[in-house]
Amino acid sequence: MSTVLPKKSMTEEDIKLQYITPAVTSKWSTGKITMETRITDGKINLKGNLVFREKPKRADYLLYLSANNPIAVIEAKDNNHSISYGLQQAMEYARMLDIPFAFSSNGDGFAEHDFLTGKEREFGLDEFPTEAELIARYKGEFGLTPAQETVIDQPYYTSQTTYPPRYYQRIAINRTMDAIARGQQRLLLVMATGTGKTY
């Protein structure tokens, strides 16, 4: 690949455009990838009489099992950092979003943390797992039947008057649907006051 800038001079956005995005889109359908996805609105801080909001947290890439079921997060860094430099940040986002796979890349390759097995590894750009491979690893770990998959893959109710769920609401919905799919007869949903249980 011929580029205008040397790799070490590229910004994070250049690395994403030239290296990471092509590596991911060659293995995943673009309809199951989102970029620069806002995770939080940013922490609200109070300093005296001033109220201000910190910058929102954004995931560079989210890969989806289905519409409301993200399966992997990818954090990109420029090439002046190691392949695994963004892995801790990706893992933080994965924990927040209840996602089983976290990846980071600097354009030379990928580092992966698999929350299902606890294993970490590094591999080349052309070795990124395909959509089918990652989904098979996920479903294989949980041993889902086709009937259970159907329940879990149900889309959320939406209308013109509903807002998209916040990340913690999505987690609560998905965990509830997962428990129902597994045939659990009794469920207890605990969320703090004001967090949107009536979503």
What are these regions (language model features)?
Residues 1-199:
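ATP-dependent helicase/translocase motor core
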